[in-house]
Amino acid sequence: WDRMSIKDFFKRRLVRLHPMVIMGTLIGAVFFYLGDCSAFPLIMETPWWKVLLMVLLGCLMIPTPVSWDIRGWWEVNSLNGPTWSLMWEYIANILYALFIRHFSKVALGIFVALAALLTIDIAFNIDTFGLLATREAAAYTFIGGWSLTPDQLYIGISRLLYPFFVGLLLSRVNKLIKIKRGFY
């Protein structure tokens, strides 16, 4: 952070992540109507103007509510399903740049512990907050995070927080694992 401003940080993230968001959304729009089948019941009922609206919202990474779904899977971007994980990555990057980068090792350790509790809550289906009751078929799994419903938001946040905070803590305590020829 000595050589990079917050603006530069955000710019680097956008340059790295956003071209694929746009490309995936445009490809999804081109092939949208070809996906008509029983697994995607809403496709043939979707007017073209709504697809264009979803293209705009998808390219801008504006998540859509369940009521705007055009495929039937309640995704935040019906044209580019995997962007749900990038949405969480964008949120993590924003929080990191504005706040989390200032956390001490102790504060990061506390957040790791809290995030671990959320992870355990989902993994063992403890359901501390009463959000997992509707997930009978997906109980004891981390399937979810791609929709703007309370249970999906909880799963998405949990999937983000633990690995994010553990990675930051490991980086701060210089306990990085070196793997010979791990990346070329």
PLM-predicted stretches and their roles:
Residues D2-S38, L42-L57, A92-N93, R159, ...:
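Transmembrane alpha-helical segments and their boundary/interface "anchor" motifs
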Residues W1-V21, W74-W84, L148-Q152:
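Alpha-helical transmembrane segments and their immediate interhelical/interface regions
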Residues K50-Y184:
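Aromatic-enriched alpha-helical transmembrane segments of multi-pass intramembrane proteins
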